[in-house]
Structure formats: structure tokens, C-alpha cells
UniProtKB/Swiss-Prot annotation:
Official protein name in the record: Uncharacterized protein YtrP
Coiled coil: none
Highest classification ranks of the organism: Bacteria, Bacillati, Bacillota, Bacilli, Bacillales
Ranges for domain GGDEF: 449-577
Gene that this sequence comes from: ytrP
Gene Ontology MF annotations: diguanylate cyclase activity
């Protein structure tokens, strides 16, 4: 009888192995269990051996983890086969018989192998599904479609969980999906979502709730909240799978964003090129500015367009093409503030809420961009709109680019003014002419409270010409002029007075400041000329209390210069009338 049982066990074992090796990968654990019970009854019918699940514990769906079946003896005719997840099976025979030795271990091994095969098959199916989802994500070129597909994929794959999205404000503005905005503070803020957004790491709130970042290569774009319904727990395996999908969607979202940005960049470049082409076809300033105004109004839906030119006296002049709002009133203090900001190096001004500037009934949004040519501020353009926050930052950057490219056309149209300016400049030293200096001084005497005039003479200049030649003399003049330009302010005026004499006018400064600047010049010329030369300087000044004519101002500086020459040169003298 024992030998017969051994033969039955061997035949059963062989049949079981054949089944495991030849069965389709689609055969489930439940199907394998049904085959096993039938085979046991067939091979061990004489012993009435049966394999039955515990009614309340039999689970057809595999649990997470690597729980394995093992057999434990209850008595000679009954064994309990169970795994760590709570699934139990009873292997039993007639009470007057014994379970064949080795059969419980063979059954446990079969169940483990069947469970492993189903797990591998399910994993393969899952990986294919994830691959298809990822492939679908990357086929989408719209940010909204990517996030919608992410929610649909998660909902279909994890039916026992609810999902919600947190999107940053700059992303939420252009997405038409149900998403919560990420608030940095306040009652609406979610500290867990914010922490995940800033760190880019997964964060568990409890056993059934977790926050998962949606991130690409360049940053985090949002946060996914997964929340179990009812008594559902969020296992580590599920969380890893959700994170895998979120990462795939994050990269696809980033690619879609870059694609949309590239399309916008191409459209902007086309707009800039077309604008530049049209503007450069025009010859007159009026035609150029009118065309530019139309393009600004169309591109940004601006209600008011203004163009300002800054002349050599820093006065604001309204250019053609400006709309009625700017024509009806003189430039206000605010426009002068814009000018000063741009003079200080600002690349533009962007105001989303202009009520503090124009009042509650005025314009709500403003953009201003400078017109710069060869590092010189020629003017600026202003766009206005009634609606608050009507201009986006992207529009602002495009506006800056358009004005930057249009400036060349505007500059060409203003060539006459530029040529007039060149006429006012000494060709050799690139300092202003004496006539322009006179004009500047007279203008300053009208609008300022004081001013300093400095007359400069290069000592022994005739000896330089006689010793080194007139070409070297010219080079000395250029070197001294360069020192002057590098030691005075942008609004000060350095001029070629005549021959080896140069002049400087410092508007709206006291004589003490003029003295310090002149001392610096005397030292700098001696150190920065080759061959080395020195200068003598005479200083005069005017104030509203001691009003002087231009002729008197020049005469006093000339007398002070003569005193410096008589006192040994290489020095400065202040006119005796100045105390």
C-alpha cells in the first residue's frame, strides 16, 4: 500500500509539473487551484483526499507582497496550508487513513508557483498598461490634455481612490481643468501640498492619503493628492505605481509646455520681424510712429499708446502716433518718474494695478519700455488699458522686444536730429562744441539754482607740438578729453573751448563740488597721459544770489586760469570773487 501511494505521489508530482510548465500565462491562481483539487481527487481517490478553502478566508485576488504558502500538520489525516495574508486551505482524507508523506509540501509548492506565475503575469500586464499610458502622455502636445489624461488613467487604474490636483498660479491661469490653486498662506493653503511642491518629494499624510509631486526635468509643476475611499489603505506598491504615472505625466506636461512656449516664441519672432520690416519701409518719423502705434494697439489690445522722445536737454517730447490721452494733457510728474527710472537703468516698467497712479477711475494697467540705441536712452513707449492686470508678463517681454527692434527704425527716422547733434560735437576730442556749451550754460541759468564753470589749459602744449609733433599734440588733446569725460557726470558738459583749451560746465552743483572734481582732473591728467602733461584750471561759479551773465562767468574763469599759470601751473585756482 505504501509503495502504491508513493507511485501515486510521483505520478501526481509529474502531472503537476507538466501543468505548470505547459499552462497558459493567462491561467489565474483560481483556475490553477481548481485544477489542483481535481487532480488530488483523481490521483488519491482511494484515500478520499480533498483540498478545500476555508469558506470565509478564500481570496481569489493576490495580496501585495511575497507571502508564501506552507503546510502544518493538524493530525495524520488533516493538514493546514496557509500563507501570511490569511488564505487557508485544508488538505484532508478519511479519518482512518493518513495523508501521504510529502503531499502537503508538494501542494504548498504548487500553490506558491501558481501565485508567483500570476503575479508575474499581472506585473507584465501592468507594465504594458503603464507603457501605453506613458506613450499616450508623450503623444499629447497640450498641457491641459496631459493632466486630464493623468486623472483619467489614475481613476481607471485605482478605482478605490479619489484624486485631486494642486496647480501653481502661473500654471492654473491657462489650464481648463478642475484643479486647486497652490496658496502659499491663508485658510485655503494646504501645508502638505505646498511642502511637496517645494521639495519635490512624496509625502504621506496618513495610511490612506498621500501627496505626489508632478515634476519634470526642470521643476515641479503641481501636486497630486491620492485619498482612499472608505477603509481603503494606500500601500507602498500602489503609491509607487501612482508616482510612476505622475512622473510620466510631469515629463509629458513639461514637454507640452516647452512645445507651446516654442510656438509662442515663433509667433513672437514673426511679429517682431514683420513689424521691423514694415517700419523700415517708411522714411518719415510720422509714418514710422503711426505704424508702430497701430501694431502696439493690435498686438496688446492697448487702449492708449504713447511715445516719448528725450532730447539733449532731457525734456520729454510727445512723438507722432500717440493717442488722444497723451495729446490732451502735458506729460505729468509720473512720466518724468518713468524717464528717471529708465535713466537709472531699468529695463522697463510693468504695473498691474495703476489706480495708485491714475486714480480709481483711471487706467488700471501700464507697460513702459525704453528706446535705447548705443546705450543711450532716446525715449520710451507707454501702453495703457482700463482693466486691472490686463497685461501678462509674457506680453510685457514681447512689448520690450518689439520696442527694442523698432528703435532702429525710429532712430533712422530721427536722423536729422542726430546729425544736428553731431554738428554740435568737436570731431577730434568728441567733446561738445563751444556753441553748444554756451547754449547749455544759458539754459541751466534759467532752470537751476547754481552752476560751476571750469576752464582747462594744457600746460606747455606748444612744447609738446614742437618736441613730438602735431599728431602727438592731437593725441594729447584726445587723452585729456577722455579723462574729462570719465570724471564728470552724464549730465555735465565737457567742451572744446579752442586750441589747447577745454571747458567743463557742472550744472546745479556748488563750487566745493566743482573744486573736488577739478582736483581729481589735475591728478588724473598727470597720471593718464603719454607723454605726460599737466593742466591748469580756472574755476568760476554762479548762484541765484550772485547772478552773472555768461560773459562774466567765462571772464572770471579765464582770470582764475591766468592766476594758476602764474602760480606755477599744474594746479587749479578759484576766482577771487568766490568766497
Amino acid at each position: 500500500m505504501v509503495e502504491q501511494t508513493k507511485d501515486q505521489l510521483s505520478a501526481f508530482h509529474y502531472h503537476m509539473l507538466d501543468f505548470l510548465l505547459t499552462k497558459s500565462e493567462k491561467v489565474t491562481f483560481t483556475d490553477s487551484f481548481i485544477w489542483l483539487t481535481s487532480a488530488i481527487q483523481t490521483y488519491f481517490s482511494t484515500l478520499c483526499v480533498s483540498l478545500t478553502p476555508s469558506p470565509s478566508d478564500f481570496v481569489t485576488k493576490l495580496a501585495d507582497g511575497e507571502a508564501r504558502f506552507s503546510a502544518s500538520k493538524i493530525n495524520a489525516s488533516c493538514y493546514l496550508i496557509e500563507d501570511g495574508s490569511g488564505r487557508r486551505f485544508h488538505l484532508a482524507c478519511r479519518q482512518d487513513e493518513e495523508i501521504p508523506e510529502g503531499l502537503p509540501d508538494v501542494v504548498a509548492s504548487f500553490l506558491n508557483q501558481s501565485m508567483k506565475q500570476e503575479r508575474l503575469y499581472n506585473k507584465t500586464i501592468y507594465q504594458k498598461k503603464i507603457y501605453k499610458m506613458t506613450e499616450l502622455f508623450h503623444s499629447l502636445l497640450d498641457q491641459t490634455d496631459v493632466l486630464k489624461q493623468l486623472l483619467e488613467s489614475l481613476t481607471s487604474t485605482f478605482s478605490l481612490f479619489e484624486f485631486s490636483l494642486f496647480i501653481s498660479h502661473d500654471q492654473d491661469q491657462c489650464l481648463g481643468i478642475p484643479a486647486k490653486e497652490l496658496y502659499m498662506e491663508g485658510e485655503k493653503s494646504d501645508s502638505f501640498a505646498l511642502k511637496v511642491y517645494l521639495s519635490g518629494d512624496i509625502l504621506r499624510k496618513n495610511e490612506s492619503v498621500a501627496y505626489i509631486p508632478i515634476k519634470g526635468q526642470q521643476g515641479t509643476y503641481g501636486v497630486l493628492k491620492a485619498e482612499g475611499t472608505g477603509d481603503s489603505f494606500l500601500t507602498d506598491a500602489c503609491l509607487d505605481e501612482m508616482s510612476l504615472l505622475a512622473n510620466a505625466a510631469g515629463k509629458a506636461f513639461e514637454n507640452a509646455q516647452l512645445y507651446e512656449q516654442s510656438k509662442a516664441s515663433i509667433a513672437n519672432l514673426e511679429l517682431i520681424n514683420e513689424t521691423s520690416r514694415r517700419l523700415n519701409q517708411r522714411l518719415t518719423l510720422t509714418d514710422t510712429m503711426n505704424d508702430l502705434a497701430v501694431r502696439m494697439a493690435e498686438s496688446f489690445q492697448a487702449e492708449e499708446v504713447g511715445f516719448f522722445h528725450i532730447d539733449h536737454f532731457e525734456n520729454l517730447t510727445l512723438l507722432p502716433g500717440s493717442t488722444a490721452f497723451f495729446k490732451e494733457a502735458k506729460p505729468s510728474d509720473f512720466y518724468n518718474e518713468l524717464k528717471e527710472k529708465l535713466y537709472e537703468g531699468e529695463k522697463g516698467v510693468f504695473i498691474g494695478n495703476g489706480q495708485s497712479v491714475f486714480g480709481k477711475a483711471g487706467y488700471g494697467s501700464l507697460m513702459a519700455a525704453p528706446m535705447i540705441q548705443n546705450d543711450r536712452l532716446l525715449g520710451f513707449a507707454v501702453l495703457l488699458k482700463q482693466e486691472l492686470y490686463a497685461f501678462t508678463f509674457e506680453m510685457y517681454k514681447l512689448f520690450q522686444a518689439l520696442i527694442h527692434h523698432a528703435t532702429l527704425a525710429v532712430t533712422n527716422s530721427m536722423l536729422r536730429d542726430r546729425l544736428e547733434h553731431l554738428v554740435k560735437t568737436d570731431q577730434l576730442t568728441e567733446l561738445y562744441s563751444r556753441a553748444y556749451l554756451d547754449e547749455k550754460i544759458q539754459y541751466s541759468m534759467k532752470i537751476h539754482q547754481k552752476g560751476v564753470f571750469i576752464l582747462v589749459d594744457i600746460d606747455n602744449f606748444k612744447n609738446v607740438n614742437d618736441t613730438y609733433g602735431h599728431q602727438t599734440g592731437d593725441e594729447i588733446l584726445i587723452q585729456v578729453a577722455s579723462v574729462i569725460k570719465s570724471n564728470i557726470r552724464k549730465h555735465d558738459v565737457g567742451a572744446r573751448w579752442g586750441g589747447e583749451e577745454l571747458a567743463i560746465y557742472l550744472p546745479n552743483v556748488p563750487v566745493a563740488v566743482g573744486k573736488r572734481i577739478t582736483e581729481r582732473l589735475v591728478y588724473a591728467v598727470r597720471k593718464n597721459t603719454k607723454p605726460e602733461v599737466t593742466i591748469s584750471c580756472g574755476i568760476s561759479c554762479w548762484t541765484t544770489e550772485t547772478k552773472k551773465s555768461l560773459k562774466e562767468l567765462v571772464h572770471e574763469a579765464d582770470e582764475a586760469l591766468y592766476s594758476a599759470k602764474r602760480s606755477g601751473k599744474n594746479r587749479l585756482m578759484i576766482h577771487d570773487s568766490i568766497k
